[in-house]
Amino acid sequence: MGHLLSKEPRNRPSQKRPRCCSWCRRRRPLLRLPRRALAKASPQPAAPRSRDCFFRGPCMLCFIVHSPGAPASAGLEEEPPLSPPPPPPRDGAYAAVSSQHLARRYAALAAEDCAAAARRFLLSSAAAAAAAASSPASCCKELGLAAAAAWEQQGRSLFLAGVGPVRFLGPLAAVQLFRAPPAPPPQAEPATALEMVCKRKGAGVPACTPCKQPRCGCGGCGGGGGGGGGPAGGGASPPRPPDAGCCQAPEQPPPPLCPAPASPASECAPIVAAAGDTVRAGGTAPSSAQQQPESGDADCQEPPENPCDCHREPPPEIPDINQLPPSILLKIFSNLSLNERCLSASLVCKYWRDLCLDFQFWKQLDLSSRQQVTDELLEKIASRSQNIIEINISDCRSLSDSGVCVLAFKCPGLLRYTAYRCKQLSDTSIIAVASHCPLLQKVHVGNQDKLTDEGLKQLGSRCRELKDIHFGQCYKISDEGMIVIAKSCLKLQRIYMQENKLVTDQSVKAFAEHCPELQYVGFMGCSVTSKGVIHLTKLRNLSSLDLRHITELDNETVMEIVKRCKNLSSLNLCLNWIINDRCVEVIAKEGQNLKELYLVSCKITDYALIAIGRYSVTIETVDVGWCKEITDQGATLIAQSSKSLRYLGLMRCDKVNELTVEQLVQQYPHITFSTVLQDCKRTLERAYQMGWTPNMSAATS
């Protein structure tokens, strides 16, 4: 078929500008169109090299405009300027309109030019020999019929139907390629369409969906037949003036078309056609040929596999949590429990597993209620992370003193040690902790039956930084060990004793005299009397006092403590039958910072509630459960008069009617009233909110 339609070898290096025929190369200095600033075309993705583009090779208009035959006649230059295209015809009228227009255009060419061009490039050797014997006119006629049939089938497979007609200055092949598949031409005018037949292999271009940006039919306009970029189809460059050879914009914009794929042929064809028209007329061609080689590097590229992909923005990247800095991820993981980190987060990926093994997560270990925690496991944990500062092994029944000793030996920086209800542990464990962890600040070892005063002595003498101790229900502890701790640990702030029958007033006195920083004191159920409790008036920083179930506690001692300890915010006097209305009235008047008052099972009446509501402006929580003398009057008056009350406990106050409580709940929604029925309602409401539904089948059975 000649070098025009032959494939370009795959191993040949890419050309920097479109290849043209010899006539163009010899006369390129004459083809100079005015230089115009072009907007930088958007880069288009390169298509796979395995696909053969129709537009590769020399420009297809060269053999028409610059045919080596006889000189072109002047009829082509005398064609009137292009006018805005008429409204797009429907269905089969596309082919008729295009055929008539191009028939008039190519009729101006010399018949010899058409014949020579067809014989040289498009016809096979046999067809050329047969056509040589015929007249030039009949040859052009046969050539047009064959081209119309071939390009109609090619255009039908390339583009969607319903796209409006586009006027081009190039050959009819370019027009058919960027137009909807035309209907078969009318039978009346089959011979007027002078089209060329392309038999090049791989001439197909992948179909694309119509784009939203309209294109001009002229190759010189932005977004025109040239498509991708460069002088012919930049899309972003300003429109050319009419004298430059571009089409005029119609009054109504044409239907949107797909942008043509960028290629050397599609970009250089309109410019060469315009230049050819000027040369044929005998005038001086504008200097556009100088700009063509310059833009060939960037514009003459293979089209993408899908030509419309160049107009689509790449999908936004999905944010990934792993893009956050490790410090932020560690802060997030710090809000997870040990189970959530070890059994959930660490199994997501290796990166999260490494983060979950960060040393800061192993500073504070909560191993409570885990029966699988043994001495061997505790030793491995301590060996892996020797910077543990807090550990909780409450209810770990599989541990022994040896495991705690290894932990204390490998974690000398331990600050907080908690071991509730570990009845298997003895003084050995507490002595090991005291010996190897001198910075210890918190020791909670409640309900350890084997703990004695010997362990407390070692703890007090070695750990001078103790601030918080809890020895509740350690029944073998006595004043001997407690006094050693009180005299040695002068920084104590919290102490809690519960049911330690061997602890008496001497221990209370020792703590009051040697530990002035005490803020929380609890001696629930201990053998303490008013003689020892009165020493607590020396504690100016006392904020919470728990004196539950002190059988020999009198009202005067309580009133004196409230008067002296101005920072007292919580007072628990439950299970003290001697506390009466007069004591409660003094507490309400003198407790300037008191917020919580617990009077369960005390000998009080409605007058105590009325006094609280009348005299106190700070008390928020009042619990008078199991007080048999409390009635509807007291509950109603305290709710009406107190401005600070937020909780009122009336559990098992049998003289308080439930209907009265229901009315109070409606009238004072800011107050929580605690009764058996009200607590049940709140519990059910929380269960429903968490998704619980009653099992009606089990209830009926």
UniProtKB/Swiss-Prot annotation:
Primary location: cytoplasm
The Gene Ontology biological process annotation of the record reads: nervous system development; neural crest cell differentiation; proteasome-mediated ubiquitin-dependent protein catabolic process; protein polyubiquitination; protein quality control for misfolded or incompletely synthesized proteins; protein ubiquitination; regulation of smoothened signaling pathway; SCF-dependent proteasomal ubiquitin-dependent protein catabolic process
UniProt keyword annotations, A-Z: Cytoplasm, Nucleus, Ubl conjugation pathway
Q: Where is the composition biased (Polar residues)?
A: 285-294
What are the start and end residues of every segment in region (Disordered)?
Answer: 73-93, 227-250, 279-321
Cite the record's Gly residues compositional bias ranges: 227-236
Check the record and name the PROSITE patterns matching this protein.
FBOX
Question: Which family does the record claim for this protein?
Answer: Belongs to the FBXL17 family.
Q: State how it assembles.
A: Part of the SCF (SKP1-CUL1-F-box) E3 ubiquitin-protein ligase complex SCF(FBXL17) composed of CUL1, SKP1, RBX1 and FBXL17. Interacts with BTB domain-containing proteins such as KLHL12, BCL6 and BACH1; specifically recognizes and binds a conserved degron of non-consecutive residues present at the interface of BTB dimers of aberrant composition. Interacts with SUFU. Interacts with PRMT1.
From the Swiss-Prot or TrEMBL record, give the protein name.
F-box/LRR-repeat protein 17
Q: Which gene encodes it?
A: Fbxl17
